Design a protein with these regions (language model features):
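N-terminal organelle transit peptides
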Residues: 1-51, 82-84, 98, 105
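Hydrophobic/aromatic-rich, well-ordered segments within soluble, folded domains that form packed cores
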Residues: 37-39, 49-74
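Short amphipathic alpha-helical coiled-coil/interface segments
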Residues: 61-65, 90-97
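Amphipathic alpha-helical coiled-coil segments
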Residues: 68-72, 99-104
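Short, charged early-sequence alpha-helical segments and their helix-coil boundaries
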Residues: 69-94
Length: 105
C-alpha cells in the first residue's frame, strides 16, 4: 500500500503504446532526442552558413534541443514542440540527418 500511495507519484510516466502501427515506444526518448539534435547541429555545420536550409535547421533544432533539456517529462516535450509524439520526433530527427548528408553532396 505504501508504494502505491507514495512512490507512485514519484515514478515517471510510462507510455505503453504509441498507437501507431510500426512505431514502438522508445523508453529513453528524451535522451535519444538530445543526442540526435546535437548530432544534427554538428552535421549541419558542413552546410554553408549563408544557406537558408542551414539557418532553418539550426533554428528549429536548437529550439527542440532546448525543450528536451528543460523538460524531463515526455508529455511536456510533445506538448511544447507540438510536432507529434516523441517517437515521431525521433523519426523526423533521423530523417533530417539523412537529408543533411544529401544536401552536402
Amino acid at each position: 500500500m505504501f508504494l502505491r500511495r507514495f512512490a507512485g507519484p514519484l515514478l515517471g510516466k510510462v507510455k505503453e503504446t504509441t498507437g501507431l502501427v510500426g512505431l514502438d515506444v522508445v523508453p529513453n526518448a528524451r535522451e535519444v532526442l538530445i543526442s540526435l539534435y546535437n548530432d544534427t547541429l554538428k552535421a549541419v555545420e558542413t552546410i554553408p552558413s549563408s544557406a537558408e536550409y542551414r539557418k532553418a535547421v539550426e533554428k528549429f533544432t536548437k529550439f527542440r534541443l532546448q525543450v528536451c533539456e528543460e523538460e524531463k517529462d515526455w508529455e511536456k516535450i510533445e506538448e511544447r514542440i507540438n510536432g507529434g509524439q516523441v517517437e515521431e520526433l525521433i523519426v523526423m530527427a533521423k530523417d533530417e540527418l539523412m537529408l543533411i548528408d544529401k544536401m552536402k553532396g
